[in-house]
């Protein structure tokens, strides 16, 4: 939705995926035999994949990849942990898209400024992450500050990183990892 390659068609898929994740994720996690919720999540991941396969990703995935490769942290967990932190970082570059995210997550209120909608979207993502049991700090996964330089070195050259809507450097990525620690 906010990658450099995003366009109207990919946005349509991503917004629908966000709506479906908002609707089905908690039920799928806490009621694993709920076929409707599991199907909803399967469709959501499929349409999200259709979008990002055509427009690329950004620094969330670029930073998640080394967490998995070096520390064997599941990719979904790494992405979910990093997502609100990177959303905060990227918000100034895509405020209009964050309004759409807030609407898709049903946290947009009429009259909100773009900045307020962005904050509501980030808060909603973080709250959903907490509710489904995602660790909120890399330290909970055994990552130490001494590991961060190695992670940032890998993340800055990751194939996904250049798609980020805001330019990043190794130093910025290191700071983002520190915020996640």
Model regions and ranges:
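Carboxylate- and glycine-rich phosphate/diphosphate-binding segment that chelates Mg2+/Mn2+
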Residues: 1-55, 171
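Glycine-rich phosphate/pyrophosphate-binding beta-alpha loops
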Residues: 46-79, 158-163
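Catalytic cores of large soluble enzymes that bind and process phosphate-bearing ligands
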Residues: 2, 6-13, 33, 55, ...
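Short, amphipathic C-terminal "tail helix"
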Residues: 144-181
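Predominant activation on well-ordered alpha-helical scaffold segments within soluble catalytic domains
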Residues: 15-26, 42-46, 60, 64, ...
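Gly/Pro-rich interdomain helix-loop hinge
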Residues: 70-147
């Amino acid at each position: 939705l906010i990658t450099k390659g995003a366009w109207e068609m990919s946005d349509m898929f991503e917004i629908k995926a966000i709506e479906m994740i908002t609707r089905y994720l908690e039920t799928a996690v806490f009621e694993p035999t709920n076929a409707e919720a599991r199907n909803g999540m399967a469709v959501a991941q499929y349409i999200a994949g259709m979008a990002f396969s055509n427009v690329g990703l950004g620094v969330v995935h670029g930073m998640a990849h080394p967490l998995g490769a070096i520390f064997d942290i599941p990719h979904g967990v790494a992405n979910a942990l990093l997502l609100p932190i990177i959303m905060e970082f990227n918000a100034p570059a895509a405020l209009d898209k964050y309004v759409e995210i807030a609407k898709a997550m049903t946290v947009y209120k009429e009259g909100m400024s773009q900045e307020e909608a962005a904050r509501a979207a980030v808060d909603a993502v973080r709250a959903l992450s907490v509710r489904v049991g995602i660790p909120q700090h890399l330290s909970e996964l055994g990552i130490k500050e001494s590991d961060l330089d190695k992670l940032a070195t890998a993340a800055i050259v990751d194939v996904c990183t250049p798609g980020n809507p805001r330019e990043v450097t190794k130093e910025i990525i290191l700071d983002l990892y520190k915020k996640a620690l």
